Amino acid sequence: MNRRHARSLILIATASGVLTACSKPDPGMGETRKLIMGTFTEDSVTDRAGKAAAATISNTVPGVYVETWPSKGAYMNIEHLFDGTYDLVIVPAGAAYEAYTGTGACEGEKKEKLRAVAACYPIVSTWISPKKLGLSKVQELKGHPLAVGNEGSETAKVSGEVFDVLGIDKENREIWYYGIQGGADGVRDQWADGIHAFTESPVPAYQELAAEDGIRFLSYTDEELDEILDGHPEYSKIKVPAGTYENQDDEVGTFCEKVLVCVSADMDEDLLHE
């Protein structure tokens, strides 16, 4: 199976999926069925998104109540989905892809019955630089000192993937492994000309800088995005609309990893449709 085809199978987020059912619960429907949704650590963004999704399902699907359970992460969620502990799980598209194809952390353990039924929110690649530099594209960061996320973090991993496509690491002698807030401080203190965040949008540390009107948001070219996505089927193109941040006048062309609600193909078809 090629990667493009696998992407089409795993990234299904239909308008008629579980998050957009519109019927109200009928008190005369009889006994309520409880479903368990695995999320992530208590009060994390993923956990809060799971609770919102669970509330939507509970309030719109007749005879169904969804209870959320914190978990130890995406791969554990997928394991518990198939051992019967969970009925639904929230996982990033990358973990879902690896499980579906039996690659990466799920090497040799295909979960071909994994189905994505809705997308909750995107994890977005967002680069910024000081406004005074006059940059508008990520590729223009070549040769500049950069803060690319804490070593071992998801932001640092994705930064490396971007560098492989753009050739940035070959020309940049100053690559600093600072987290998002540390990188933002680097822009203020003028030792970083660019910082990267691979996280939910808007980024709080960026909001503070944007309010000071001292930064610009950088876009990828369409060709760069095509090359990045070609090697990473878990990613999708996305536009960050103008006005997402204060003093952000232009939309930003970038990519994201969707966080998905997934179920097993063995789930009752009528319930899944609801």
PLM regions with names:
Residues 3-8:
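N-terminal export leaders
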Residues 268-273:
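Short amphipathic alpha-helical coupling segments at ligand-binding clamshell hinges
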